[in-house]
């Protein structure tokens, strides 16, 4: 039964992608404005439904102006989860671009790929600057990796410099907490529970195998906490700004865990 369900889900994943991808490619030829995020958002919503990912929203995303959404990171599935409500471009590590299927699909949401290579640094800085100048909102995962969702590790501050450049004076930063609430229709308790949704640095499971295992499950319930926006104009030090955002995201996870245990 689980294998049949997983097969149906993977077939639906393929069919939905085959419908949306050509249309999105055509749209991107003519426009990369806010309208170019509509189909990816529909794709994310459809796939969350197909894979049984239920999302609870606490708070509201800041959409009144250009915003950098700063979130903890548990899994490649976070892309779908956040994509259901945020019309923004992801900033991802360069190796994501080479992932089978997901690498290609991520480009359809105008993802900016970055690396630690000095050779690529200037080109990547130009790409990010262009996105900021074009008033695009961004989604970043400043932990620099993914975790099993138990804690939020310290943020790397480098990407926060985007919001502190003198020529950028009207960018808000909104901390966002992702928290697993339930997997397979029960509370998250064991490491296996965490690893059903999370795909993190301490795992050796290939992406495809992990997705298949998740497809065989009863899905997951994920909470998204949108915290109070932070005005980048009030900061001049990216490390302090990163620490402030980390505290908001980390406290959000701690409070969620306390609430669910009561």
Q: What do these predicted regions represent?
A:
Residues 128, 132, 136-140, 144-155:
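Soluble extracytoplasmic domains of inner/organellar membrane proteins
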Residues 65-71, 136-142, 171:
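Generic beta-sheet signal
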Residues 102-103, 150-236:
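A cross-family acyltransferase "interaction/gating" segment
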Residues 110-117, 148-150, 195-198:
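Surface-exposed cleft-lining segments at the edges of enzyme active sites
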Residues 227-231, 235-236, 240-242, 250-262:
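Membrane-proximal, solvent-exposed terminal domains/tails of membrane-associated proteins
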């Amino acid at each position: 039964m689980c294998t049949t369900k997983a097969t149906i889900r993977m077939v639906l994943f393929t069919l939905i992608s085959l419908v949306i991808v050509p249309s999105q490619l055509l749209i991107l030829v003519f426009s990369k404005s806010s309208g170019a995020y509509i189909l990816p958002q529909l794709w994310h919503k459809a796939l969350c439904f197909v894979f049984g990912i239920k999302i609870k929203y606490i708070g509201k995303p800041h959409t009144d102006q250009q915003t950098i959404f700063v979130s903890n990171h548990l899994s490649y599935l976070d892309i779908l989860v956040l994509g259901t409500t945020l019309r923004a471009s992801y900033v991802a590590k360069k190796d994501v671009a080479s992932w089978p299927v997901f690498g290609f699909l991520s480009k359809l949401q105008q993802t900016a790929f970055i690396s630690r290579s000095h050779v690529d640094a200037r080109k990547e800085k130009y790409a990010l600057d262009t996105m900021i100048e074009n008033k695009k909102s961004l989604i970043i995962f400043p932990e620099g990796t993914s975790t099993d969702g138990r804690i939020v590790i310290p943020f790397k501050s480098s990407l926060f410099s985007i919001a502190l450049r003198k020529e950028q004076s009207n960018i808000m930063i909104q901390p966002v907490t992702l928290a697993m609430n339930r997997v397979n229709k029960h509370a998250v308790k064991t490491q296996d529970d965490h690893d059903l949704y999370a795909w993190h640095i301490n795992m050796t499971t290939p992406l495809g195998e992990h997705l298949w295992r998740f497809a065989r499950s009863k899905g997951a319930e994920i909470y998204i906490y949108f915290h109070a926006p932070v005005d980048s104009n009030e900061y001049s030090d990216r490390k302090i700004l990163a620490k402030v955002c980390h505290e908001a995201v980390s406290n959000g996870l701690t409070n969620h865990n306390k609430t669910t245990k009561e």
